[in-house]
Protein backbone atom coordinates (compact mmCIF):
# COMPACT_ATOMS: atom_id res chain seq x y z
CA UNK A 1 0.00 0.00 0.00
CA UNK A 2 2.80 2.43 0.80
CA UNK A 3 4.58 1.80 -2.47
CA UNK A 4 1.31 2.33 -4.33
CA UNK A 5 0.37 5.41 -2.32
CA UNK A 6 3.60 7.17 -3.30
CA UNK A 7 4.08 5.52 -6.71
CA UNK A 8 7.49 4.55 -5.36
CA UNK A 9 10.56 4.67 -7.58
CA UNK A 10 14.18 4.31 -6.49
CA UNK A 11 17.53 3.39 -7.96
CA UNK A 12 16.27 1.07 -10.72
CA UNK A 13 13.68 3.36 -12.36
CA UNK A 14 15.86 3.78 -15.45
CA UNK A 15 15.28 0.07 -16.14
CA UNK A 16 11.97 -0.83 -14.49
CA UNK A 17 10.03 2.42 -14.25
CA UNK A 18 7.82 3.47 -11.35
CA UNK A 19 5.47 1.34 -9.25
CA UNK A 20 2.48 2.10 -11.50
CA UNK A 21 4.22 0.27 -14.36
CA UNK A 22 3.82 -2.99 -12.44
CA UNK A 23 0.29 -2.76 -11.04
CA UNK A 24 -2.17 -4.84 -13.07
CA UNK A 25 -5.09 -4.55 -10.69
CA UNK A 26 -6.19 -3.01 -7.40
CA UNK A 27 -8.93 -3.64 -4.89
CA UNK A 28 -9.65 -0.50 -2.88
CA UNK A 29 -12.10 0.73 -0.29
CA UNK A 30 -13.00 4.35 -0.98
CA UNK A 31 -13.75 7.06 1.54
CA UNK A 32 -17.45 6.45 0.81
CA UNK A 33 -17.08 2.80 1.82
CA UNK A 34 -17.39 1.42 -1.71
CA UNK A 35 -15.26 -1.60 -2.66
CA UNK A 36 -13.80 -1.22 -6.16
CA UNK A 37 -12.03 -3.94 -8.15
CA UNK A 38 -9.96 -1.93 -10.62
CA UNK A 39 -8.73 -3.50 -13.89
CA UNK A 40 -8.80 -7.05 -12.41
CA UNK A 41 -5.33 -7.96 -13.66
CA UNK A 42 -6.00 -7.42 -17.34
CA UNK A 43 -3.32 -6.31 -19.81
CA UNK A 44 -5.81 -4.81 -22.28
CA UNK A 45 -8.91 -3.04 -21.05
CA UNK A 46 -10.11 -0.15 -23.20
CA UNK A 47 -13.39 0.53 -21.41
CA UNK A 48 -13.04 4.12 -20.31
CA UNK A 49 -11.14 5.73 -17.46
CA UNK A 50 -8.54 3.52 -15.75
CA UNK A 51 -9.31 4.42 -12.14
CA UNK A 52 -6.47 2.37 -10.65
CA UNK A 53 -4.04 5.11 -11.69
CA UNK A 54 -5.88 7.65 -9.55
CA UNK A 55 -5.11 5.60 -6.46
CA UNK A 56 -1.45 5.05 -7.40
CA UNK A 57 0.42 8.07 -6.06
CA UNK A 58 -2.60 9.47 -4.20
CA UNK A 59 -0.87 9.11 -0.80
CA UNK A 60 -3.89 7.29 0.63
CA UNK A 61 -6.15 10.31 0.23
CA UNK A 62 -8.82 8.55 -1.88
CA UNK A 63 -9.11 5.16 -0.22
CA UNK A 64 -7.38 2.14 1.26
CA UNK A 65 -5.68 -0.46 -0.94
CA UNK A 66 -6.64 -3.96 0.23
CA UNK A 67 -5.40 -6.14 -2.63
CA UNK A 68 -2.87 -5.76 -5.45
CA UNK A 69 -2.18 -7.73 -8.61
CA UNK A 70 1.45 -7.19 -9.56
CA UNK A 71 3.31 -8.05 -12.73
CA UNK A 72 6.43 -10.12 -12.07
CA UNK A 73 9.86 -9.97 -13.72
CA UNK A 74 12.72 -12.45 -13.91
CA UNK A 75 15.71 -11.91 -11.66
CA UNK A 76 18.59 -10.11 -13.42
CA UNK A 77 21.73 -12.11 -14.12
CA UNK A 78 25.31 -11.15 -13.26
CA UNK A 79 24.71 -7.53 -12.33
CA UNK A 80 27.92 -5.60 -12.88
CA UNK A 81 28.75 -2.18 -11.43
CA UNK A 82 31.03 0.58 -12.69
CA UNK A 83 32.06 3.65 -10.72
CA UNK A 84 33.59 6.47 -12.74
CA UNK A 85 35.35 9.64 -11.62
CA UNK A 86 34.15 12.57 -13.70
CA UNK A 87 35.74 16.04 -14.12
CA UNK A 88 32.58 18.05 -14.95
CA UNK A 89 28.91 17.45 -14.32
CA UNK A 90 28.11 17.87 -18.02
CA UNK A 91 30.36 14.87 -18.65
CA UNK A 92 28.00 12.71 -16.58
CA UNK A 93 25.26 13.40 -19.09
CA UNK A 94 27.60 12.51 -21.97
CA UNK A 95 28.56 9.26 -20.25
CA UNK A 96 24.89 8.40 -19.70
CA UNK A 97 24.17 8.97 -23.39
CA UNK A 98 27.20 6.93 -24.48
CA UNK A 99 26.18 3.89 -22.43
CA UNK A 100 22.45 4.12 -23.12
CA UNK A 101 23.03 4.26 -26.87
CA UNK A 102 24.63 0.80 -26.81
CA UNK A 103 23.53 -0.95 -23.60
CA UNK A 104 20.53 -1.49 -21.33
CA UNK A 105 21.34 -0.06 -17.91
CA UNK A 106 19.64 -1.14 -14.69
CA UNK A 107 20.86 1.92 -12.77
CA UNK A 108 22.70 5.18 -13.36
CA UNK A 109 23.42 7.18 -10.22
CA UNK A 110 25.60 10.16 -9.44
CA UNK A 111 27.12 11.76 -6.34
CA UNK A 112 29.67 14.46 -5.69
CA UNK A 113 33.01 14.70 -3.92
CA UNK A 114 31.38 16.08 -0.77
CA UNK A 115 29.44 12.82 -0.41
CA UNK A 116 32.55 10.71 -1.04
CA UNK A 117 34.66 12.70 1.45
CA UNK A 118 32.03 12.21 4.17
CA UNK A 119 31.76 8.50 3.35
CA UNK A 120 35.51 7.90 3.45
CA UNK A 121 35.80 9.71 6.78
CA UNK A 122 33.57 7.06 8.40
CA UNK A 123 35.94 4.23 7.47
CA UNK A 124 33.01 2.07 6.37
CA UNK A 125 33.59 2.59 2.64
CA UNK A 126 36.73 2.17 0.57
CA UNK A 127 37.92 4.69 -1.98
CA UNK A 128 37.04 3.24 -5.42
CA UNK A 129 40.31 4.39 -7.04
CA UNK A 130 43.25 6.69 -6.28
CA UNK A 131 42.23 9.57 -8.55
CA UNK A 132 40.12 12.29 -6.93
CA UNK A 133 37.17 13.67 -8.87
CA UNK A 134 34.53 16.38 -8.29
CA UNK A 135 31.75 14.07 -9.49
CA UNK A 136 31.13 10.34 -9.68
CA UNK A 137 28.83 8.18 -11.77
CA UNK A 138 27.72 4.71 -10.71
CA UNK A 139 26.15 2.56 -13.39
CA UNK A 140 24.87 -0.99 -13.31
CA UNK A 141 24.03 -3.43 -16.08
CA UNK A 142 23.35 -7.10 -16.65
CA UNK A 143 26.32 -8.96 -18.09
CA UNK A 144 25.33 -12.61 -18.56
CA UNK A 145 27.64 -12.90 -21.58
CA UNK A 146 31.28 -11.90 -22.13
CA UNK A 147 30.52 -9.66 -25.16
CA UNK A 148 28.47 -7.36 -22.92
CA UNK A 149 31.44 -6.90 -20.60
CA UNK A 150 33.62 -6.19 -23.62
CA UNK A 151 31.13 -3.60 -24.86
CA UNK A 152 31.08 -1.88 -21.45
CA UNK A 153 34.88 -1.72 -21.41
CA UNK A 154 34.95 -0.30 -24.92
CA UNK A 155 32.48 2.46 -23.99
CA UNK A 156 34.50 3.19 -20.85
CA UNK A 157 37.69 3.54 -22.92
CA UNK A 158 35.89 5.78 -25.41
CA UNK A 159 34.74 8.02 -22.56
CA UNK A 160 38.30 8.16 -21.22
CA UNK A 161 39.56 9.18 -24.67
CA UNK A 162 36.97 11.96 -24.83
CA UNK A 163 38.15 13.29 -21.47
CA UNK A 164 34.79 12.60 -19.84
CA UNK A 165 36.25 10.15 -17.30
CA UNK A 166 39.29 10.58 -15.05
CA UNK A 167 39.37 7.06 -13.62
CA UNK A 168 37.10 4.10 -13.08
CA UNK A 169 36.57 0.61 -11.74
CA UNK A 170 34.33 -2.28 -12.79
CA UNK A 171 33.20 -4.99 -10.39
CA UNK A 172 34.63 -8.48 -10.88
CA UNK A 173 32.44 -10.23 -8.30
CA UNK A 174 29.13 -9.93 -6.47
CA UNK A 175 31.00 -8.82 -3.35
CA UNK A 176 32.85 -6.06 -5.19
CA UNK A 177 29.60 -4.88 -6.79
CA UNK A 178 28.02 -4.66 -3.32
CA UNK A 179 31.01 -2.71 -2.01
CA UNK A 180 30.79 -0.23 -4.88
CA UNK A 181 27.07 0.25 -4.27
CA UNK A 182 27.89 1.35 -0.71
CA UNK A 183 29.34 4.54 -2.22
CA UNK A 184 25.80 5.51 -3.18
CA UNK A 185 23.59 3.70 -0.69
CA UNK A 186 25.42 4.85 2.47
CA UNK A 187 25.27 8.57 1.65
CA UNK A 188 21.97 9.42 3.39
CA UNK A 189 22.92 7.69 6.62
CA UNK A 190 26.43 9.17 6.59
CA UNK A 191 25.39 12.80 6.15
CA UNK A 192 22.56 12.53 8.70
CA UNK A 193 24.99 13.58 11.44
CA UNK A 194 25.32 16.96 9.69
CA UNK A 195 21.59 17.70 10.17
CA UNK A 196 20.99 18.15 6.44
CA UNK A 197 18.26 20.20 4.84
CA UNK A 198 16.97 17.79 2.20
CA UNK A 199 15.01 18.14 -0.98
CA UNK A 200 13.78 15.50 -3.42
CA UNK A 201 13.22 17.22 -6.76
CA UNK A 202 13.20 16.41 -10.46
CA UNK A 203 13.56 18.12 -13.82
CA UNK A 204 13.87 16.88 -17.38
CA UNK A 205 17.08 14.88 -17.74
CA UNK A 206 18.36 17.27 -20.42
CA UNK A 207 17.99 20.24 -18.01
CA UNK A 208 19.78 18.69 -15.02
CA UNK A 209 23.21 20.35 -15.56
CA UNK A 210 21.71 23.85 -15.84
CA UNK A 211 19.45 23.26 -12.86
CA UNK A 212 22.28 22.10 -10.59
CA UNK A 213 24.44 25.05 -11.67
CA UNK A 214 21.61 27.46 -10.83
CA UNK A 215 21.03 25.97 -7.38
CA UNK A 216 24.77 25.94 -6.58
CA UNK A 217 25.01 29.59 -7.59
CA UNK A 218 22.01 30.57 -5.45
CA UNK A 219 23.35 28.82 -2.36
CA UNK A 220 26.93 30.11 -2.74
CA UNK A 221 25.75 33.69 -3.30
CA UNK A 222 23.30 33.80 -0.41
CA UNK A 223 24.81 31.34 2.06
CA UNK A 224 28.54 30.89 1.30
CA UNK A 225 29.07 28.96 4.55
CA UNK A 226 26.57 26.24 3.53
CA UNK A 227 28.04 23.04 2.09
CA UNK A 228 25.97 21.38 -0.63
CA UNK A 229 25.96 17.62 -1.17
CA UNK A 230 24.36 16.29 -4.34
CA UNK A 231 23.37 12.76 -5.25
CA UNK A 232 20.52 11.10 -7.08
CA UNK A 233 19.05 9.05 -9.86
CA UNK A 234 20.45 10.94 -12.81
CA UNK A 235 19.01 8.40 -15.25
CA UNK A 236 15.50 9.72 -14.55
CA UNK A 237 16.22 13.34 -13.59
CA UNK A 238 15.64 12.83 -9.85
CA UNK A 239 18.01 14.89 -7.70
CA UNK A 240 18.59 14.81 -3.95
CA UNK A 241 19.76 18.21 -2.74
CA UNK A 242 21.33 18.18 0.71
CA UNK A 243 22.62 21.28 2.48
CA UNK A 244 24.77 20.45 5.51
CA UNK A 245 24.47 22.50 8.69
CA UNK A 246 27.55 24.59 9.56
CA UNK A 247 28.96 23.84 13.01
CA UNK A 248 28.59 27.45 14.14
CA UNK A 249 24.82 27.50 13.52
CA UNK A 250 22.16 26.12 15.83
CA UNK A 251 19.55 23.80 14.33
CA UNK A 252 16.87 26.46 14.70
CA UNK A 253 18.95 29.12 12.95
CA UNK A 254 19.91 26.69 10.20
CA UNK A 255 16.40 25.54 9.41
CA UNK A 256 15.10 29.11 9.57
CA UNK A 257 17.57 30.04 6.84
CA UNK A 258 16.66 26.89 4.92
CA UNK A 259 13.06 28.06 4.72
CA UNK A 260 14.37 30.93 2.59
CA UNK A 261 16.46 28.46 0.58
CA UNK A 262 13.26 26.46 0.02
CA UNK A 263 11.70 29.40 -1.78
CA UNK A 264 14.76 29.84 -4.00
CA UNK A 265 14.88 26.11 -4.78
CA UNK A 266 11.20 25.78 -5.62
CA UNK A 267 11.23 28.94 -7.73
CA UNK A 268 14.07 27.36 -9.71
CA UNK A 269 12.14 24.09 -9.97
CA UNK A 270 9.20 26.05 -11.36
CA UNK A 271 11.47 27.87 -13.82
CA UNK A 272 12.57 24.48 -15.20
CA UNK A 273 9.03 23.03 -15.21
CA UNK A 274 10.15 20.43 -12.69
CA UNK A 275 8.61 18.74 -9.66
CA UNK A 276 8.98 19.76 -6.01
CA UNK A 277 8.65 16.07 -5.09
CA UNK A 278 10.11 13.44 -7.38
CA UNK A 279 9.44 10.32 -5.32
CA UNK A 280 8.71 11.16 -1.68
CA UNK A 281 5.25 12.62 -2.10
CA UNK A 282 3.75 15.90 -0.90
CA UNK A 283 2.24 14.99 2.46
CA UNK A 284 2.08 17.96 4.83
CA UNK A 285 5.65 19.25 4.52
CA UNK A 286 5.46 20.23 0.87
CA UNK A 287 1.77 21.09 0.77
CA UNK A 288 2.41 24.87 0.93
CA UNK A 289 4.64 24.60 -2.14
CA UNK A 290 2.39 22.53 -4.39
CA UNK A 291 1.70 25.55 -6.62
CA UNK A 292 5.31 25.55 -7.77
CA UNK A 293 4.58 22.33 -9.69
CA UNK A 294 0.80 22.27 -10.09
CA UNK A 295 -1.21 25.27 -11.35
CA UNK A 296 -4.44 26.24 -9.58
CA UNK A 297 -6.56 24.63 -12.30
CA UNK A 298 -4.92 21.24 -11.75
CA UNK A 299 -5.24 21.49 -7.98
CA UNK A 300 -8.95 22.26 -8.39
CA UNK A 301 -9.34 19.03 -10.39
CA UNK A 302 -7.43 17.13 -7.68
CA UNK A 303 -9.83 18.48 -5.06
CA UNK A 304 -12.81 17.50 -7.22
CA UNK A 305 -11.49 13.94 -7.55
CA UNK A 306 -10.96 13.80 -3.78
CA UNK A 307 -14.57 14.92 -3.27
CA UNK A 308 -15.89 12.09 -5.46
CA UNK A 309 -14.08 9.27 -3.65
CA UNK A 310 -13.87 10.77 -0.16
CA UNK A 311 -16.66 13.34 0.29
CA UNK A 312 -16.30 13.39 4.08
CA UNK A 313 -12.53 13.94 3.96
CA UNK A 314 -11.66 11.01 6.20
CA UNK A 315 -8.84 9.51 4.11
CA UNK A 316 -5.38 10.73 5.20
CA UNK A 317 -6.81 14.17 5.84
CA UNK A 318 -4.62 17.24 5.50
CA UNK A 319 -2.26 15.71 2.96
CA UNK A 320 -1.34 17.10 -0.50
CA UNK A 321 -3.82 20.03 -0.25
CA UNK A 322 -6.39 21.45 2.16
Question: What are these regions, as identified by a protein language model?
Answer:
Residues 35-56, 220-221, 259-273, 303:
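Short, hydrophobic/aliphatic alpha-helical segments
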Residues 70, 74, 80-264, 268, ...:
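C-terminal substrate-recognition/cap domain of FAD-linked oxidoreductases
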Residues 24-44, 209-213, 248-260, 287-293:
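A short, flexible low-complexity segment enriched in Lys/Arg and Gly/Pro that occurs
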Residues 270-282, 311-315:
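Alpha-helix capping/hinge segments and adjacent helical runs
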Residues 34, 287-322:
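Activity-critical C-terminal alpha-helical subdomain
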Residues 114, 234-237, 276-288:
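Small/polar glycine-rich anion-binding or flexible loop at a beta-alpha turn
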Amino acid sequence: GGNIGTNAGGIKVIKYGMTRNWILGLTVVTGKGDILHLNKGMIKNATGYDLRHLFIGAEGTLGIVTEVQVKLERQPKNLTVMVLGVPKFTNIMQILSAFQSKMDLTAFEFFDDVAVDKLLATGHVQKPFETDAPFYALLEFEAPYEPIMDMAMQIFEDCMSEGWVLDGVMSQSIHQAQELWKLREYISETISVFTPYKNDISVLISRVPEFIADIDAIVSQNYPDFQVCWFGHIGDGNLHLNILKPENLSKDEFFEKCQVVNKYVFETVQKYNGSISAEHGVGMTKKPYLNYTRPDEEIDYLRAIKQVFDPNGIMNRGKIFD
